[in-house]
């Protein structure tokens, strides 16, 4: 069964030009909430966020829907560059 981090990695790496440079980490925030941190190279940031943030919004929607199926109440997604 695919976990939240693996699912997020699958989605983001399928978008990126260089999938080996993508890192995904998960942190507990509260009892029922998690923080997913997606770390991408600077040159991939525009591709991951998309025009007007549409790709980032779609990623957030898919990840939150997946988390809901795993009985997680709230998931926050951060996208950072290095």
Give the ranges of each region predicted by the language model.
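RNA-contacting regions in translation and RNA-metabolism proteins
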Residues: 1-47, 55-82
């Amino acid at each position: 069964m695919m976990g939240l981090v693996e699912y997020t990695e699958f989605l983001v790496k399928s978008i990126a030009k260089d999938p080996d440079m993508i890192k995904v980490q998960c942190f507990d925030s509260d009892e029922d909430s998690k923080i997913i941190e997606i770390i991408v190279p600077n040159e991939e940031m525009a591709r991951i966020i998309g025009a007007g943030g549409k790709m980032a919004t779609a990623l957030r929607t898919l990840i939150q829907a997946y988390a809901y199926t795993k009985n997680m109440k709230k998931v926050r997604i951060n996208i950072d560059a290095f």
